[in-house]
Regions:
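Short, charged/polar surface micro-motifs in flexible loops or helix N-caps
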Residues: 44-45, 54-58, 75-79, 125-128
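A short, N-terminal "cap"/entry segment at the start of jelly-roll beta-barrel domains
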Residues: 1-61
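Double-stranded beta-helix
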Residues: 2-14, 109-132
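Short, surface-exposed beta-edge/turn micro-motifs
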Residues: 46, 67-70, 115-116
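Short, conserved beta-strand element in jelly-roll/cupin
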Residues: 65-80, 84
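Short histidine-centered beta-strand/loop micro-motifs
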Residues: 38, 58-65, 82-83, 91-92, ...
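Short acidic-glycine-tyrosine-enriched beta hairpin
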Residues: 84-104
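Structural motif
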Residues: 77-79, 98, 117
Length: 132
């Protein structure tokens, strides 16, 4: 057993209750494409677990069509904005220890005042992005 930095090496939770340490996270879109290829056999049941530190608001919206995403704030505060597919919107500010769920098909982004760290548990298959 070894200790691993989740910010550097995310975890894939897969079919059959597997947990796979992922290669070094680069933040590039190619990393996510390679991740999808590595775990294609898990389909919509796979989950990517990551932790990110933010010092600025997001410059994109994202949407996960294949499943829910859990956003767990572990430090600081972040304001999560959601645009649901029925046209409604929601906003919630999370502080350390609080979480929210982005339902499948919900566009979401976040604002950060200062800095914040969050853990994401994401059904990433088919994830889309658009400019903010």
């Amino acid at each position: 057993m070894t200790a691993t930095d989740i910010s550097a090496h995310p975890i894939h939770l897969g079919v059959g209750a597997t947990a796979v340490v992922e290669p070094l996270f680069t933040g590039e879109m190619t990393w996510y494409a390679d991740y999808t290829d590595r775990h294609a056999d898990d389909g919509t049941e796979g989950r990517l677990v990551t932790m990110h530190r933010f010092t600025a608001s997001w410059d994109v919206w994202e949407m996960h069509p294949s499943g829910s995403e859990v956003v767990l704030c572990t430090d600081g505060a972040l304001t999560l904005h959601q645009e649901h597919d029925d046209g409604t919107a929601a906003t919630v500010t999370l502080v350390a220890g609080e979480y929210a769920v982005n339902p499948p098909g919900t566009w979401h982004t976040a604002d950060v005042d200062g800095s914040a760290t969050a853990v994401f548990i994401t059904a990433g298959l088919g994830t889309e992005h658009r400019p903010r």
